[in-house]
Amino acid sequence: MTTDYFTRKQSYSGFSDGADSPGSPLASRTNPLSSKVTSVLSASYADSDIRDALSLLDKRGIQNTAETRRQLRLDVHREVIESNGDIIREFGHVAEEASELMKQQEQMQAKQELLNAFNAHFVMSDDDIAMLTSTAEPVNDRFFSILSRAKKIQNDCEILLGTENQRLGLEIMEQTSKNINGAFQKLYRWIQREFKTLNLENPQISSSIRRALRVLAERPSLFQSCLDFFAEARENILSDGFYTALTGTTVGGDEDPSIKPIELVAHDPLRYVGDMLAWTHSATVGEREALEVLFISDGDEIAKGIQAGLDSEPWNRIAESEDEVGHFDGLKALNELVDRDVAGVARVLRQKIGQVIQSHEETIMAYKIANLLNFYRGTFQRLLGDDSVLLDSLATLEESALRQFRALMRDHITSLQAETQVAPPNLSPPDFLHEGLKQLTAIMKTYETSFTSPETREAGFEPILTEAFDPFMKGSENVAKDLSAPRSTIFTINCLLSARATLAPFDFTISRVSQIKDTIEEHAATLIDHQYIFFLEKSALQPLLQALSATTDIRDHPVFQPASLIQASQTLDDFLPSALMDAMENLKDLQNSMLVRQITEEAAEKFCDDFEKVEERLMKADEEREESLDEKDGEPHHVRALYPRTGGEIRVLLSIRIWNMFKTWRLEIT
């Protein structure tokens, strides 16, 4: 302050550096002496600064001399500079320490910020830990948010484990893992509580439980335990529902008036079994749809969670095969869960249907039940896949029904074999064959309604034909053995025709129909031969044919002597008027008129061919006789004149008469 005062006063007292020199413009206007006087007079000596300055000058013992006044300013500046230098020297180390402290402060601030960031990222608050692990806290969006943060902390701890000091990372990872495990345990117990009150019939299933399942899937063991609990609960619910549907009363004994009990139709086995299977199918479809909403509606998030859990727990996969570890099949898991839910229903279903199968001894009913079971087995196979407890139960029941069907068929065949079976007088199919074919028709109509694939349809019905068709045809063959020819052949053809008419309308018996057709043709060939022989014998053509085959020169053969030829010609003429009538009479018991016509035509054709051979041989014999005789021997003896009928005449007569006789015969049969 004193220094400032002296500096300021010097500018007023004339100790300036010549600012008011005579050469300046101001000097030309003002007298220097006047300025100094004015400056002195204008100063207030009552000012404390002036007094302090004067007191200081007095203490320094400064003499008021011209030299002193000239040096005073310099001395003051020098002292000021020296004072400042002393101050700088004295406070230099303080400045250094202050700078060091500022650097330390910056470092501390950086460490504090790093610590805060570390705590914010890696350290969870007590409230967050309580939200994760305490069962008193709800499972809400905040819970899942904190759990996501905890999992992120656990993953980021890998960075800390990469540092030189791994202790911090290990401690944080241990604590975080403990918190996460506690959170999953809390989530597991919460889902179990929710499952107890879950209503799958409600189309708006809580989104929170779906989210909880997606998260819990990251712990496959807990997720599987949860599914086991759920499956057991649903199995009990569906079993109770099936019991109510069967009886109309709940497990507790309360009657439900809104339900018509299935057991009311127990007197109708097929409807009873069908209603039980229909209820099971409806329940299975509803269960699957509800579980799709619960487990698959959010895409493959659960599958991703389970896969992530499997990847993070390799020790759980040591005993598993590579196929099981490689990929989680969500659809297969869903099918398995649905199958477990209906396992209780499957047990009751197996018991009830098994009782129906064993208590009814109707052959057709047993097969209809087997066919119904086959239909539902295919339906459930498309719904649940190939590996299913319900499918196994249905397959077992189907096999049981087929065994019952086969056993009843064998018993029926055995009873028929014990009876003496004879062919009816008109050689029509016997009653037991009619009964068997009628039964087979009912079976085929039932099989026709099944959803068997076209590729396996015919092969699938072949075992049924073996049980329900072949024994009856075998019985018919045994009856035919007791008949003489051609009655046995006619009886056999009638049975085959009836069988073919029964099988032909169905597309899954084409092979059998073709086999029957071939067999009919074989037996028809036998009848053709029989009719052919009949034509030969009754027309007296057979001795002529035999003679032609035995000798080359017929002139000396007894059969071709005039008397024999005249007798043969007369026999032929007597035969022709009634030939077709007699031939038709042989086949009057054959029940297919078109087949009768075909057999007769072919036999007549063979007869005409043989007659033309005889005619040709007789004409040739006459020509040879004419060449061997001389003119003087007289006219030759012509054998052809003794046997005048021609092949053309025979063909015309038979072709015309066969039509007329066939029409007359059909009218008589009709």
UniProtKB/Swiss-Prot annotation:
Biased composition (Polar residues): 1-14
GO biological-process terms attached to the record: intra-Golgi vesicle-mediated transport; protein transport
Cross-referenced Pfam families: COG6_C, COG6_N
UniProt-annotated stretches for the region Disordered: 1-32
Chief location category: Golgi
Subcellular localization, as worded in the UniProt entry: Golgi apparatus membrane
Matches recorded under SMART domains: COG6
Membrane-protein topology: Peripheral membrane protein
Any one cellular-component term (Gene Ontology): Golgi transport complex
Keyword annotations from UniProtKB, A to Z: Golgi apparatus, Membrane, Protein transport, Transport
Keyword match RNA-binding: no
Assigned protein family: Belongs to the COG6 family.
PANTHER family: COMPONENT OF OLIGOMERIC GOLGI COMPLEX 6 (PTHR21506), CONSERVED OLIGOMERIC GOLGI COMPLEX SUBUNIT 6 (PTHR21506:SF0)
Free-text function comment from the UniProt entry: Acts as a component of the peripheral membrane COG complex that is involved in intra-Golgi protein trafficking. COG is located at the cis-Golgi, and regulates tethering of retrograde intra-Golgi vesicles and possibly a number of other membrane trafficking events.
Protein name: Conserved oligomeric Golgi complex subunit 6
Source organism of this protein record: Sclerotinia sclerotiorum (strain ATCC 18683 / 1980 / Ss-1)
Lineage of origin: Eukaryota, Fungi, Dikarya, Ascomycota, Pezizomycotina
